[in-house]
């Protein structure tokens, strides 16, 4: 055999030939090869597995090919080891022995029995029951001049399967909110894959597939075959070619991944862009919706504060709701109606929440049952959960809320199925299939008969033992069993002379002899046959029960979805009760009025000795753009986030942290809050800021809410102020979006006198003799001081630095070219770059000023003229 890259120069053993043949079919996977009681990996896979799992790397003989690297682990511990590999981003193929080694002629037959990837896993050791685990496919297409992307995604553990199409430019934001664990993409789309890998969250595995899988014909064939239909018109997806391609890719990938029956994927839904709000990456991050900006964890996020769900299904739905707020008035109001009724009926609410806490995760239980991964205990828990549905249903049927009554109608207790599960499974039995005994006595006559034979035969063996002791006068004679020799009679060496002639020797030990007799052989056959038949029949009955449950997949999934929504609504009511939230008044106007609003996260973090300062917000047709000035640490950014979170909560269907709120529906929430370098992509703070600002200006509408903080601070004062000024003009005149614009450019306060819908607000402070106190109250009017030196003092700057800063600031405010120098230091010339607009300059500038026609200047022209005047003042111009 020719020498390979891995150093094999001679003929390998038959088992290694079998291994290499399987490995060749699954080149992108770590191949776990079952050998006896172990899963073993060889060659390069062994090196990888040894390093990833921190287990011993050894070597084994490979016949004439010499020794090869080997790493392995016991099969009974495989779930934990596989979980570690998948969590680290590897794909794993499991190759099992599919015949009894004792009966094998030659090499034991082996086949791939399971494939586990980040997007295809059912293991509790990998999954978080409060998060979805999505497998996603992306299929870009070009229609004329328009570049689109078809996206499909599935959570195999919950059967959620949906698709959409969107402009290619919106793909990153969509995937960021979806956060799939694995993304399938065509080999021809290398540039797109690299772009997504750079800009998306870390942790997603990109799996490249052959081009032929990404065709409309192939997708139609796969989808129609899966859903057993000749047309996809009934699913409402006929107009979405790229989305269908992506959906077809997912199904084919799952089928090739040995996922068993996928019949529980009974429907595919469409993500309607007009129904829910799209939150871009920046908004999700800046508002800290599901993770904090500080460390990316749940701590300090909105989700952490309001997640009072009682069931994993509700927790997953709440997460999806927060990332996709509603855009239509009717569904928002219906959720508010339901929350209001649950708030006003605490006994009903707590009764519902108590029952939800006792119901199993139906979605994931169903998926494991349908794919033959469930244990008997989980199936029994599903039956017990179905048995609770009638009581829950009765609590909802008299509701005033239309949405609660609709949810009640969707709850199907499936009484016959629940009764069958109760009759079939023994509540006291072991939870594993291997141990047996889980089918209840009386459920199946043949199984009861086999168990009786087995039990009776065991009694007969005890009789044989007693009879032979009497016949032989050997009181220590024992009838025993092992897997190699079966049942035998064991006699000590000291008593071997008492053994009758009809005893047939089976084995000689150091201190004993083992025999069999005709009567023992007869009953051994009865016992083993009955036990084997009993085990096979019990397993068959369990599989039939699982198939019966899988046939009801559509009904169980509908019930699960209703339970999840009910959990979220009850969660919102609980939050409103606990935190003092109010019901917002929603309408289709463009006004936003919040009275005594609070930041939902900060108010929970602050202690009793530092109560949260509530603030009003009025923005709309008369006050369209609020310019908010004031020092750092005064609460400007928190105020912006507070307003954004109040609006988001309202459109999710939750009550809001305020005394009152009236909110005209928002179609998008855009934020630009704080610096966020993207240095790994070669983008500076300012470039990132401008990219985000440009995206906002290009996508916002009159119905959008814009929350902009410190635009332009990443560049020079002159450039930054020019950009901030120009953006305000554009938003006011062109977009007319409701906007909160926090800035340290106090010169922007001039905009109020020039534009009818721009209004100044400021974050108030109180000055004392030697310090300032930040009140964190937003009030009408502009601020005239940034108090930057006071903030530096609070941060612990050395006193001499603070004192020197005050001297320099005083000189700048007097507009001196020569500023006061430090004592015992050389004179220092400071060039002030902080330009004030519309002031008279020195007499030497009068000639230049007199030639300017102010009435014909645009704001941008005025800034350019000011730049020229500055250069004259600094001796750079004429």
Swiss-Prot record:
Belongs to the DNA mismatch repair MutS family. PANTHER family: DNA MISMATCH REPAIR PROTEIN MSH1, MITOCHONDRIAL (PTHR11361:SF34), DNA MISMATCH REPAIR PROTEIN MUTS FAMILY MEMBER (PTHR11361). It comes from the Bacteria. This is DNA mismatch repair protein MutS. Keywords: ATP-binding, DNA damage, DNA repair, DNA-binding, Nucleotide-binding. Pfam families: MutS_I, MutS_II, MutS_III, MutS_IV, MutS_V. This protein is involved in the repair of mismatches in DNA. It is possible that it carries out the mismatch recognition step. This protein has a weak ATPase activity. SUPFAM superfamilies: DNA repair protein MutS, domain I, DNA repair protein MutS, domain II, DNA repair protein MutS, domain III, P-loop containing nucleoside triphosphate hydrolases. ATP binds at residues 630-637. The keyword Kinase does not apply. One of its GO terms (biological process) is mismatch repair. The keyword Secreted does not apply. Coiled coil: none annotated. InterPro entries: DNA_mismatch_repair_MutS, DNA_mismatch_repair_MutS-lik_N, DNA_mismatch_repair_MutS/MSH, DNA_mismatch_repair_MutS_C, DNA_mismatch_repair_MutS_clamp, DNA_mismatch_repair_MutS_core, DNA_mismatch_repair_MutS_N, DNA_mismatch_repair_MutS_sf. It comes from Chlorobaculum tepidum (strain ATCC 49652 / DSM 12025 / NBRC 103806 / TLS) (Chlorobium tepidum). GO terms for cellular component: cytosol. GO terms for molecular function: ATP binding; ATP-dependent DNA damage sensor activity; damaged DNA binding; mismatched DNA binding.
């Amino acid at each position: 055999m020719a020498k390979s890259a891995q150093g094999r120069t001679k003929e390998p053993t038959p088992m290694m030939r079998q291994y290499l043949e399987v490995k060749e079919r699954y080149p992108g996977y770590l191949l776990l090869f079952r050998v006896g009681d172990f899963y073993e990996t060889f060659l390069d896979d062994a090196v990888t597995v040894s390093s990833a799992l921190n287990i011993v790397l050894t070597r084994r003989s490979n016949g004439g090919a010499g020794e090869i690297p080997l790493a392995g682990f016991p099969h009974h511990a495989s779930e934990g080891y596989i979980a570690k590999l998948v969590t680290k981003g590897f794909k794993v193929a499991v190759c099992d022995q599919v015949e009894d080694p004792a009966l094998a002629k030659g090499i034991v037959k082996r086949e791939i029995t399971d494939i586990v990837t980040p997007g295809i896993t059912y293991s509790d050791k990998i999954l978080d029951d409060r998060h979805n685990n999505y497998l996603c496919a992306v299929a870009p297409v070009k229609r004329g001049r328009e570049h689109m992307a078809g996206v499909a995604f599935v959570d195999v553990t919950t059967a959620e399967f949906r698709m959409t199409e969107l402009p290619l430019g919106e793909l990153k934001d969509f995937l960021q909110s979806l956060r799939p664990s694995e993304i399938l993409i065509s080999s021809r789309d290398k540039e797109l894959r690299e772009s997504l890998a750079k800009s998306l969250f870390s942790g997603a595995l990109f799996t490249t597939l052959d081009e032929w899988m990404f065709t409309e014909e192939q997708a139609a064939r796969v989808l129609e075959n899966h859903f057993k239909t000749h047309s996809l018109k009934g699913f409402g997806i006929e107009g979405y070619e790229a989305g269908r391609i992506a959906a077809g890719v997912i199904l084919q990938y799952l089928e090739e991944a040995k996922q068993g029956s996928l019949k529980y994927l009974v429907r595919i839904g469409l993500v309607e862009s007009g129904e829910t709000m799209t939150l871009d990456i920046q908004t999700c991050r800046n508002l800290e919706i599901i993770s904090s900006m500080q460390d990316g964890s749940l701590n300090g996020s909105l989700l952490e504060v309001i997640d009072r769900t009682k069931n994993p299904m509700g927790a997953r739905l709440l997460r999806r709701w927060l990332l996709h707020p509603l855009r239509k008035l009717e569904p928002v109001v219906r959720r508010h109606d339901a929350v209001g009724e649950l708030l006003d009926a605490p006994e009903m609410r707590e009764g519902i929440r108590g029952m939800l806490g006792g119901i199993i995760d139906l979605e994931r239980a169903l998926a494991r049952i349908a794919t033959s991964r469930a244990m008997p205990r989980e199936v029994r828990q599903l039956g017990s959960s179905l048995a609770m549905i009638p009581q829950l249903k009765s609590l909802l049927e008299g509701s005033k809320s239309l949405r609660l009554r609709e949810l009640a109608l969707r709850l199907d207790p499936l009484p016959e199925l629940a009764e069958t599960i109760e009759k079939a499974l023994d509540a006291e039995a072991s939870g594993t299939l291997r141990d047996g005994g889980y089918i209840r006595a009386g459920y199946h006559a043949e199984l009861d008969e086999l168990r009786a034979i087995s039990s009776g035969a065991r009694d007969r063996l005890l009789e044989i033992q007693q009879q032979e002791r009497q016949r032989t006068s050997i009181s220590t004679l024992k009838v025993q069993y092992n897997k190699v020799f079966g049942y035998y009679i064991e006699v000590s060496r000291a008593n071997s002379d008492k053994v009758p002639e009809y005893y047939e020797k089976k084995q000689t030990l150091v201190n004993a002899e083992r025999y069999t007799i005709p009567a023992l052989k007869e009953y051994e056959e009865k016992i083993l046959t009955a036990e084997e038949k009993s085990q096979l029949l019990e397993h068959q009955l369990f599989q039939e029960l699982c198939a019966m449950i899988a046939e009801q997949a559509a009904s169980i999934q509908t019930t699960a979805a209703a339970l999840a929504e009910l959990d979220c609504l009850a969660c919102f009511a609980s939050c409103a009760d606990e935190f003092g939230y109010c019901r917002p008044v929603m309408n289709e106007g463009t006004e936003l009025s919040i009275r005594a609003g609070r930041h939902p996260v900060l108010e929970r973090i602050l202690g009793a000795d530092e109560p949260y300062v509530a603030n009003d917000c009025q923005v709309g047709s008369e006050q369209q753009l609020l310019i908010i000035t004031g020092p750092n640490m005064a609460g400007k950014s928190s105020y912006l986030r507070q307003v954004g979170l109040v609006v988001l909560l309202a459109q999710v269907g939750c009550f809001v942290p305020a005394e009152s709120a009236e909110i005209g529906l928002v179609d998008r929430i855009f934020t630009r809050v704080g610096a966020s370098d993207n240095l790994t992509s070669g983008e500076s703070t300012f470039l990132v800021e401008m990219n985000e600002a440009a995206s906002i200006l290009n996508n916002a509408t009159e119905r959008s809410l814009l929350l902009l903080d410190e635009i332009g601070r990443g560049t020079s004062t002159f450039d930054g102020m020019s950009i901030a000024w120009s953006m305000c003009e554009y938003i006011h005149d062109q977009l007319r979006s409701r906007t909160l614009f926090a800035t340290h450019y106090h010169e922007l306060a001039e905009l109020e006198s020039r534009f009818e819908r721009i209004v100044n607000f400021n974050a108030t402070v109180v000055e004392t003799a030697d310090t300032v106190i930040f009140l964190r109250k937003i009030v009408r009017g502009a601020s005239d001081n940034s108090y930057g030196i006071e903030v530096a003092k609070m941060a612990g700057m050395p006193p001499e630095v603070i004192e020197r800063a005050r001297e320099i600031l005083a000189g700048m405010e007097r507009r001196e070219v020569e500023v006061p120098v430090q004592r015992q230091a050389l004179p220092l010339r400071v060039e002030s770059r902080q330009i004030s607009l519309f002031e008279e300059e020195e007499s030497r500038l009068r000639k230049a000023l007199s030639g300017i026609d102010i009435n014909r200047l645009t704001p941008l022209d005025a800034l350019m003229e000011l730049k020229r005047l500055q250069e004259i003042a600094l001796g750079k111009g004429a």
